[in-house]
Regions:
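General beta-strand structural signal in soluble alpha/beta enzymes
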Residues: 24-29, 51-52, 72-76, 83, ...
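Conserved oxyanion/phosphate-binding beta-strand-loop segments in alpha/beta enzyme cores
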Residues: 15-36
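Conserved glycine-rich FAD pyrophosphate-binding loop
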Residues: 2-6, 20, 38-48, 70, ...
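C-terminal cap/substrate-recognition region of VAO/PCMH-type FAD-linked oxidoreductases
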Residues: 250, 260, 265, 276-283, ...
Length: 569
């Protein structure tokens, strides 16, 4: 246990233990490490990690934090990529407590499963499983849902994802606690469900799902998308979506941990069981952009998703994301979640042993899975060899014929080069998993080449919707400082992930600032969907949102490179 700043902090640990038991109050460096270390960025010391088992215990723990002047970081799955789920290297003036919500994972379906009430630790994977039995699906259905990310975490960070009809994760219906400037805790119930007036009674009823149908407000109109589908079609000089967009900032939505969220109410969508997947290859980025504009201008419904990756990113995924690809393809999401947890635990153990490092489990996994055949379908590897740029396009089954016709006519034109094919079931699954594997490939590459690299320099970028020159071309003096780069993203939204590994001896902070400025000069917004965390300075309008939610600055202090001091001092 780290040394508390004062006796009051030590007393707080005793109070937490009385609330949830010693087993769920973690204080040793080894026990807290999986919670205090970010996936790519962020690490720091905490007084304790709390693992409450109920919403009422969350509420009671918050009261202890207020009474003992502690900073609270409410953490869900800790899958964030910018360090905002844990402490950072900042000048904190109070001890920090992480409150992990993962034990509180209940989900209540309401209004004939057209909406869901997800408690603080409910995962997207669990929600997806629960909704499938009702022929429904949640906002996010790929990517973060496979590594244990939570519904509340997605709302708090306005996560985007691949579903171009749906837009960022957003709700105006949530139940949360905020602390006012006088240090008083307020429970705010905007779920649209009458649960009474006493906070502990409300939270207990909420967790048990104890309400009458008549106490629940009706759902919104049912559809396969949102207004975002019309928004993304507009080819104007602004990004389609980005983290600081005030359109998507409302209480829990975009809160980045500046309040304590107990549950959110989100709409669900009809599950499209009949889908068609097309794999598209070209050597010219301009052809993909022209194709994007053809689909956005078409009269029919938007595709479900349109995911880009370079051929080089494909190669990185099959070499350095192979454990992700093989595990998901042959064992499923549940096994991958367990594997991530086991790897995190093992890295924590190895880090404490002489002669080992904090990435030993990654090295072992990399070696073991290199011996396993990936069995990638031949048409995918053929396109990998033939074309530099790839697009994975998923459409509704009813749009299969129209999509194939559009693609045939597009590539028949003398001004365009490339080819396509409709995937069979194995090809569709494999292509999707390779695209997902790219997201972890650059991180694994860095881990395996740490001796020759200084740091990862990563971006998630929201480009202008009308940006024709969308693929980054770095000046030579910047490109020479990079050892590796991977480009991939949600192409129709013009949201790209650009993961770089800087060479040994390069100043990654200075390099990131220079590269960020190049993007801003192009009219892009950074970040697009991973939020500001500990690596991006939040703009003024977003800081104003944070300060309104948290006037004492006791929740996730310092996020977005803001002040870590009490009262924003």
């Amino acid at each position: 246990m780290r040394t508390p700043r004062n006796q009051r902090s030590a007393e707080a640990v005793e109070a937490f233990t009385r609330i949830m038991g010693r087993k769920h109050v973690l204080t040793s460096a080894r026990a807290t490490a999986p919670f205090t270390t970010g996936d790519r960025f962020g690490a720091g010391e905490v007084l304790a990690v709390l693992r409450p088992g109920s919403l009422v215990d969350m509420w009671r723990a918050l009261q202890v934090c207020v009474d003992h002047d502690l900073i609270v970081i409410t953490q869900a799955a800790n899958t964030g990529l910018t360090g905002g789920s844990g402490p950072g290297d900042q000048d904190y003036d109070r001890d920090i407590v992480i409150l992990s919500t993962l034990r509180i994972d209940g989900i209540h379906l309401i209004n004939d499963a057209r909406e869901a009430i997800s408690l603080a630790g409910a995962t997207l994977f669990s929600l997806e499983e629960k909704l499938a039995a009702h022929g429904r699906e949640p906002h996010s259905v790929i990517g973060s849902s496979s590594i244990g990310a939570t519904v509340v975490g997605g709302i708090a960070n306005n996560s985007g994802g691949s579903q171009m009809r749906k837009g960022p994760a957003y709700t105006e219906q949530a139940i949360f606690a905020r602390v006012d400037e006088d240090g008083r805790i307020h429970l705010v119930n905007h779920l649209g469900i009458d649960l009474g007036t006493d906070p502990t009674h409300i939270l207990d009823r909420l967790e048990r799902g104890d309400w009458d149908a008549a106490d629940v407000t009706p759902p919104p109109p049912d559809s396969t998308g949102t207004d975002y589908a019309d928004h993304v079609r507009q080819l104007v000089d602004t990004p389609a979506r980005f983290n600081a967009d005030p359109t998507f900032l409302h209480e829990a939505s975009g809160s980045a941990g500046k309040i304590m969220v107990f549950a959110v109410r989100t709409r669900t969508f009809p599950l499209e069981k009949d889908k068609a997947t097309f794999y598209i290859g070209t050597d010219r980025p301009s052809d993909l952009e022209a194709l994007r504009r053809e689909f956005l201008a078409a009269d029919g419904p938007l595709p479900i998703s349109g995911e880009y990756m370079s051929a080089h990113a494909f190669d990185l995924a099959t070499e350095y994301g192979k454990d992700t690809y093989v595990s998901l393809k042959h064992a499923g999401s549940r096994t991958l979640v367990r594997m991530f947890a086991l790897k995190g635990w093992a890295n924590g153990v190895f880090a404490k042993l002489p002669g080992f490092g904090p990435s030993t489990a990654d090295a072992i996994s990399q070696k073991l899975f290199s011996l396993v055949p990936e069995n990638i379908p031949s048409r995918l590897t053929d396109y990998r060899d033939r074309f530099d740029h790839h697009l994975l396009l998923v459409v509704s089954g009813s749009e299969r014929a129209a999509t194939a016709q559009l693609l045939r006519e597009f590539f028949a034109g003398p001004e365009h080069e490339g080819d396509f094919f409709e995937c069979d079931a194995d090809e569709a699954q494999s292509a999707t998993l390779i695209r997902f594997g790219v997201a972890s490939a650059a991180s694994r590459y860095y881990v395996m080449h740490r001796a020759e690299a200084s740091a990862m320099v990563t971006f998630d970028v929201a480009l202008r919707r009308d940006d024709e020159d969308w693929l980054e071309r770095l000046p030579e003096e910047i490109a020479d400082q990079l050892r590796e780069s991977a480009y991939y993203g949600h192409f129709f939204c013009h949201v790209l992930h650009q993961d770089h590994v800087a060479k040994k001896g390069v100043d990654p902070v200075a390099l990131k600032k220079r590269m960020t400025q190049l993007l801003v000069d192009r009219g892009a917004a950074v970040p697009a969907e991973h939020n500001y965390g500990r690596i991006y300075p939040a703009p003024e309008q977003l800081v104003a949102h944070y300060r309104e939610l948290d006037p004492l600055n006791m929740f996730n202090a310092g996020v977005g490179e803001t002040s870590a001091k009490k009262g924003w001092g």
